[in-house]
Amino acid sequence: MPFYLYGMSASSSAITLSGIFIYPVKSLGGISLPAAELTPRGLRHDRRWLIVDARNRFMTQREHAEMALLAVEPAYNGFLLRHRQRPELLPLYMPFEAQPDKTLFVTIWDDMVWAWRGTPEADAWLSEALGQPCKLVYMSDMVRRDVEPDKPELNPAGTVVSFADGYPYLLATEESLAKLNAQLEEPVPMNRFRPNLVVSGALADAELSWAGFSIAGQPFRSVRGCGRCIVTTIDQATAQQNPAGEPLRTLATYRKPDRKVLFGQNVTGPASGRIEVGDAVVLG
């Protein structure tokens, strides 16, 4: 029988940080890190780049599953974009941080913020890779995008966020994934859920009830469970959507309070610091 730490209290086992991930470009692949710096917007270099369409509106795998075919690989002071199925498209190098250049207003959900333009080469590469006109833009430190601007009770500290959907950090546990996979005909990897912080040693599903925790002594605040969408059904290696709607369909059978299918926890954290894989996670 799979081991989910059932019957144990969270305090009776050591909870540790087992994975750290950044996604330099929103809705593209992630990079696994052994350690990361904390910033006011989340992990350093996480979701600071964004792909927008001809109307300067954000693009994600929700409407463009083919974005999963654009792999992101670490490179010196930046990353490479590589198309998994089109080797004739030479990899594109991008720095983690853009240089000040032309600006434009872009829309992400209900927010309109200004961003720096990337490069003509990046725009051309992405337009060819995705089969439609698009641009790559960067969020400067001078841009303010507040977490939950219409719900200040969820953001008492005035936390800001990058181009992430809503919060600086997304946390998931290995045990919750193991519990889900035990119910699936075809198990799914953690990359379906795009977390920043992965922990092990917790009770399955327990993260949804955490009020707060610390990593290496640095405080984080759990805000609310993360409502999941169709992206979880997209194979991140092939861009093919699961015809049965899995794993979302199975998750909905036991993790659907208030009409939202939840997996993982939205989190805010300190404005500075450093975390490493293997760090202790302490609840409370």
Q: Could you tell me what each predicted segment is?
A:
Residues 2-284:
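Metal-cofactor-dependent catalytic cores
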